Amino acid sequence: MDIAIQHPWFKRALGPFYPSRLFDQFFGEGLFEYDLLPFLSSTISPYYRQSLFRSVLDSGISEVRSDRDKFVIFLDVKHFSPEDLTVKVQEDFVEIHGKHNERQDDHGYISREFHRRYRLPSNVDQSALSCSLSADGMLTFSGPKVTSGMDAGHSERAIPVSREEKPSSAPSS
């Protein structure tokens, strides 16, 4: 007999304020004062974190937008330079890979690596894809959508990452 395991009522009720820490990406970012408050962190659950003080785009989490005329991905890669990033399109997917070797920072030595894969909508014009890195470390991958009668063209190719001198205009939803 299968038994459904449910969280206690207070965890279910406060779920939106304490999202799961399973997918946290705050490696090496340090602690905030609210991380150290025992009545907020340990009484609810060690697997939940208060996320009211961080914006989605400031946390390393990507934002994907797909409207009528374009497809855009915003990704915070502030710890990487354009030389550390590889963006390629393979069939219906865009793959973004970032890696920098061990380097010294304020607290010792650190190396970072990530790999993201996103499915492209079938009507994105793959010959007009672009990718840029803003001065504040926001990677913007975008491509226009084509009308339904045209072929979007699917092949594997690398997309160069260009550097912008101004900060990103991505909203911090």
Curated annotation (Swiss-Prot):
GO terms for cellular component: cytoplasm; nucleus. Acetylation at Lys-70 may increase chaperone activity. Undergoes age-dependent proteolytical cleavage at the C-terminus. Zn(2+) 3 binds at residue 154. Belongs to the small heat shock protein (HSP20) family. PANTHER family: ALPHA-CRYSTALLIN A CHAIN, HEAT SHOCK PROTEIN HSP-12.2-RELATED. Contributes to the transparency and refractive index of the lens. Acts as a chaperone, preventing aggregation of various proteins under a wide range of stress conditions. Required for the correct formation of lens intermediate filaments as part of a complex composed of BFSP1, BFSP2 and CRYAA. This is Alpha-crystallin A chain. It comes from Phocoena phocoena. The gene is CRYAA.
